């Protein structure tokens, strides 16, 4: 199939704008980095090249309140009542007439790259399993060392991915989807690193790349939670297919 690299890299493409080094989406909570559109609306602020995070979810639909539409500013999705923000009724349906002439901005993507080290026994210094978790809609792909270890692309409702670095187990929608070792074996890259059972050997260094693509022109919600023991090097890239902020 056709590579989607052009959607996430810095190449010039018709109808595409890229934003590099964007900050502010992930919040530190109890040893984890987290973001959940259910509870916190996120809007991209071009002047700061950062996300503005709000203390309530924005944009709703019948099945999941709190959507991820970062190219729609807060004043488009909220009203202010009694000094607090309330949803103004705009929904994820991309129909101008339904949304009173204000359709939300679909067709965008986000990518994140971070280096991490496998801690002793796959546990953090808080004695918790090191994990990477995602839940949401639309497409998500997770690569480690350029090996596809998490794939929830295609047509689907809200889906989940869990990678446990203590055990090496990978689950999609709560069901087993192999292990880190089996994914590397399928890619014929298991010889590129050291192993302890089905997970990485202690002290090995790796690079995780996360790709999120909203292409369905309907729902867009995202929940991220991870406690990777990181090497200080990360970046976030955002782009809007229509070139809008």
Residue ranges and their predicted role:
Residues 241-245:
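Solvent-exposed, low-complexity, repeat-rich "mucin-like" stalks and linkers
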Residues 1-240:
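Acidic/polar, compositionally biased interaction segments
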């Amino acid at each position: 199939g056709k590579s989607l690299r052009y959607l996430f890299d810095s190449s010039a493409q018709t109808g595409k704008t890229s934003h590099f080094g964007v900050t502010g989406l992930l919040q530190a909570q109890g040893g984890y980095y987290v973001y959940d559109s259910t509870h916190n609306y996120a809007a991209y602020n071009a002047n700061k090249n950062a996300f503005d995070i709000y203390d309530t979810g924005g944009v709703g639909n019948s099945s999941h309140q709190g959507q991820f539409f970062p190219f729609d500013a807060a004043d488009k999705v909220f009203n202010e009542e009694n000094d607090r923000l309330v949803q103004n009724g705009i929904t994820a349906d991309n129909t101008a007439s339904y949304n009173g002439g204000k359709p939300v901005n679909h067709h965008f993507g986000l990518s994140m790259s971070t280096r991490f080290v496998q801690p002793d026994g796959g546990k953090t210094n808080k004695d918790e399993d090191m994990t990477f978790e995602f839940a949401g809609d639309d497409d998500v792909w997770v690569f480690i060392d350029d090996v596809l270890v998490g794939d929830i692309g295609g047509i689907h409702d809200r889906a989940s991915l869990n990678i446990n670095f203590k055990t090496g187990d990978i689950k999609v929608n709560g069901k087993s989807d192999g292990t880190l070792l089996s994914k590397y074996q399928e890619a014929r890259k298991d010889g590129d690193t050291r192993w302890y059972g089905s997970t990485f050997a202690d002290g090995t260094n790796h690079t995780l790349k996360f790709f999120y693509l909203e292409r369905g022109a309907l729902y867009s919600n995202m929940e991220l939670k991870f406690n990777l023991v990181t090497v200080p090097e990360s970046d976030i890239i955002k782009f809007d297919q229509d070139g809008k902020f």
